[in-house]
Swiss-Prot record:
Species name: Homo sapiens (Human)
The protein, known as: Coiled-coil domain-containing protein 78
Cross-referenced InterPro entries: CCDC78, DUF4472
GO cellular component entries: centriole; cytoplasm; deuterosome; perinuclear region of cytoplasm; sarcolemma; sarcoplasmic reticulum
Pfam families: DUF4472
GO BP annotation list: cell projection organization; de novo centriole assembly involved in multi-ciliated epithelial cell differentiation; skeletal muscle contraction
Taxonomic lineage of the native organism: Eukaryota, Metazoa, Chordata, Craniata, Vertebrata
Keyword set, alphabetical order: Cell membrane, Cilium biogenesis/degradation, Coiled coil, Cytoplasm, Cytoskeleton, Membrane, Sarcoplasmic reticulum
Subcellular location, record wording: Cytoplasm, Cytoskeleton, Microtubule organizing center, Centrosome, Centriole; Cytoplasm, Perinuclear region; Cell membrane, Sarcolemma; Sarcoplasmic reticulum
Top-level taxon in the UniProt lineage: Eukaryota
Amino acid sequence: MEHAATTGPRPGPPSRRVENVVLRAKDWLPGAPGGTAVWATSLEAEVPPDLALNKEQQLQISKELVDIQITTHHLHEQHEAEIFQLKSEILRLESRVLELELRGDGTSQGCAVPVESDPRHPRAAAQELRHKAQVPGHSDDHRFQVQPKNTMNPENEQHRLGSGLQGEVKWALEHQEARQQALVTRVATLGRQLQGAREEARAAGQRLATQAVVLCSCQGQLRQAEAENARLQLQLKKLKDEYVLRLQHCAWQAVEHADGAGQAPATTALRTFLEATLEDIRAAHRSREQQLARAARSYHKRLVDLSRRHEELLVAYRAPGNPQAIFDIASLDLEPLPVPLVTDFSHREDQHGGPGALLSSPKKRPGGASQGGTSEPQGLDAASWAQIHQKLRDFSRSTQSWNGSGHSCWSGPRWLKSNFLSYRSTWTSTWAGTSTKS
């Protein structure tokens, strides 16, 4: 601490105020013999020599004490100034209240005399006393003449004040009743409007509930229809697969039987015809599966659109105010989309000009030779044709029995079935002709 005091800037000489404070402190405290204060002698006696304060520290402490006293003095002055301001404000308000009371009394009396002329006013009373003091020879007759007037004024003033107050109270009551009646009318109007709004909201909620029930039922029916459609598609696919397998089996048996007969050209023609027929059937099946897939996608898209519309309706009816959207059951297009039954066979029919052109038009092979399935393949013996005819007859009977049980194995166009039956009848007639010739 001493090091800091020696190295720091040396303070200047103490001001006169500090010296006065120090002198006053010395005057207040009793001194010891020799001119030193008691607290100084006791401090010197108690504090060791190495802890004794130097003059700079003493001056610093004295300066801080003086600053504290100055701050306290400023605060005291500020407090007194605020008290004076508050008192002056109170006096001003009291004078204003008194002036307003006097003005109200003067207005109720209906006289336009100044406030100082009022005998109740302190200034008027003081002037009257001063006038009486200046005129000591004031006659008693004049005093008696003035006294009845002064004695009658308070009664008239009280009567006028009472009548004025009654009029004001009556006007205030009438005004209050008129305002209350207007408020009652306004409240009744608002109540009717609120009741109408509640009824409209209730009706809208009922309509929304009814439409939601209808929408849910339609969605349920749509889901049931989709489930039934999926089930029927699976069943149809299974039947088609079974039909294709049986047809392939019969065709390969016919080809093997023809190969066993040893007629090479006729066997090649029959094989080509059967392979072309199977390929057309496979193409028809693929086209039908693609159509069913497109129909399923369209149904799914419609379901998503319907769900979105349902959500929009719910949001529109839940929002405050009038609904922006109107739910119309007639606008729902819940009828199934028409699935086209056009297959590759119909396209070929349009291109070649007729149902029989598919079988009658020859196919160009890569080798350049035209090999086509003719309507009357020649060159087979009677035994081969008899076996082929028997196989086809068995297949036809099994197909008829399957159709009779409520199923339909033929999913292609009708003209292909008629051509197949006509081709079978042609084989039968050819076999009958060859058998008679033999």
